[in-house]
Amino acid sequence: MRLSVAAAISHGRVFRRMGLGPESRIHLLRNLLTGLVRHERIEAPWARVDEMRGYAEKLIDYGKLGDTNERAMRMADFWLTEKDLIPKLFQVLAPRYKDQTGGYTRMLQIPNRSLDRAKMAVIEYKGNCLPPLPLPRRDSHLTLLNQLLQGLRQDLRQSQEASNHSSHTAQTPGI
């Protein structure tokens, strides 16, 4: 028997649809990438940020090739809708990551959007000049697992105290 995750079964789809069609998806990704390069930190729904992350990383890889590389210039020209950001890609972002081979972005989940409860995320380029985001604590005492463990410990402590009390009264004879 083979266990598989339902999300891994794509039936020919290799990316999220995110919109009306393939052209709409590309326009959405281009606008998100442009915003990320301009502001170096944006927030959007989790699915869009997760889909855009690979393109943001690849754009930095092309930026590291330099503005004299024809393919890098074509990719920057295509993906950045605001052409004044092309020099920023080649002269600011690419030199920042010249010693890294990947992992240029950080993605954090933030509270859900209040209107439709959509799962939201923040994506940012690492090493930006913005104040750092607070990293979520993984092992909070409020998680379900930690609450269950705390209850188990209390039950064990109570049963040990009860058994100690009953064994203590059994050993001491009554007067």
From Swiss-Prot:
Protein's organism: Homo sapiens
Transit peptide feature range: 1-8
Matches recorded under InterPro entries: Ribosomal_bL17, Ribosomal_bL17_sf
Alphabetical UniProt keywords: Mitochondrion, Ribonucleoprotein, Ribosomal protein, Transit peptide
GO biological process, one term: mitochondrial translation
Name of the protein this chain belongs to: Large ribosomal subunit protein bL17m
Localization (cell): Mitochondrion
Region annotation (Disordered) ranges: 155-175
